[in-house]
A protein has these predicted regions:
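Structural detector for internal amphipathic alpha-helices that build alpha-solenoid repeat scaffolds
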Residues: 10-28, 39-62, 71-75, 80-95, ...
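Non-catalytic, polymerase-adjacent accessory regions of viral genome-replication enzymes
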Residues: 1-6
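Buried hydrophobic core positions in alpha-solenoid tandem helical repeats
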Residues: 37, 68-71, 100-106, 135-140, ...
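TPR/TPR-like (Sel1-like) alpha-helical repeat modules
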Residues: 174, 198-205
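Short, intrinsically disordered/low-complexity patches at protein termini
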Residues: 105-106, 202-205, 217-219
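Ankyrin repeat arrays, specifically the small/polar loop and inter-repeat linker segments at the C-terminal end
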Residues: 110-111
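Core helices of alpha-solenoid repeat scaffolds
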Residues: 34, 62-66, 95, 99, ...
Length: 227
């Protein structure tokens, strides 16, 4: 099992400002974790990769790799390589299959690494099915996860309309989830939420205000009897 060094915390001091020996040790750890992932995928699936990010950038439709990628989530702790594994799971053949494992990983990672938590949430929103909505709503309602929750409202694309509307009402009030919620409202044309969207559109100038105005215009167009 590849274990990440717990001493790596770059909030106070970025990697490039650290002594060369520490930088070398960091990259050695990244290379070791990546080699482990590539070896496992080669042995399990016959895939020849230079990096786990080859799956993200060069490949699509690799159902044979999904079970091994899910196992690797528990084997690799290096955040750089774990991010590649998580991003590789945002793949059509992982829909439904990877969601439960990503929910577990989100709970474990997001409180102390919101950046990686955000990536996990993004992949989770992609692979979630209707049966995962209650667990995802619980994550969205837990403020301990902070802005790692930002992409999770997109998972409500698979929810019943009534569930999506009810959830989006309170998600619009949360600064961490508001923007993604607006986009979901626009895509699903949740006209029941027009008043809340208009309130944001009429608010202080901000890129989100412009997006809210566009969403509100789309909702008006979708409202029966609208001029």
């Amino acid at each position: 099992m590849c274990q990440a060094m717990t001493k790596w915390d770059f909030k106070e001091r970025p990697l490039h400002e650290r002594p060369q020996a520490e930088q070398d040790a960091w990259w050695a750890e990244v290379r070791a974790a990546n080699a482990h992932v590539c070896r496992r995928l080669r042995e399990a699936c016959g895939m020849e990769l230079d990096s786990v990010y080859d799956l993200v950038n060069k490949h699509n439709n690799y159902p044979q790799a999904i079970p091994t990628l899910l196992e690797l989530l528990g084997e690799v702790d290096n955040p750089n390589i774990k991010e590649g594994i998580v991003r590789a799971l945002a793949e059509k053949s992982a829909i439904g299959v990877a969601a439960d494992r990503l929910i577990q990983e989100f709970r474990r990672v997001a409180p102390h690494n919101p950046g990686l938590g955000w990536v996990i949430g993004n992949s989770l929103a992609f692979v979630a099915r209707k049966e995962h909505v209650p667990a995802i709503l619980a994550l969205l309602n837990d403020k301990r996860f902070g802005d790692a929750r930002q992409p999770l409202p997109d998972a409500l694309k698979v929810a019943d309309r009534s569930t999506a509307v009810a959830a989006c009402r309170w998600l619009l009030e949360d600064p961490d989830t508001r923007w993604c919620t607006l986009k979901l409202i626009g895509r699903r044309k949740l006209t029941e939420l027009g008043e809340g969207v208009k309130r944001i559109a009429d608010g202080p100038k901000h890129p989100m205000q412009r997006d809210a105005a566009k969403v509100y215009a789309k909702l008006i167009e979708s409202t029966p009897g609208a001029d």
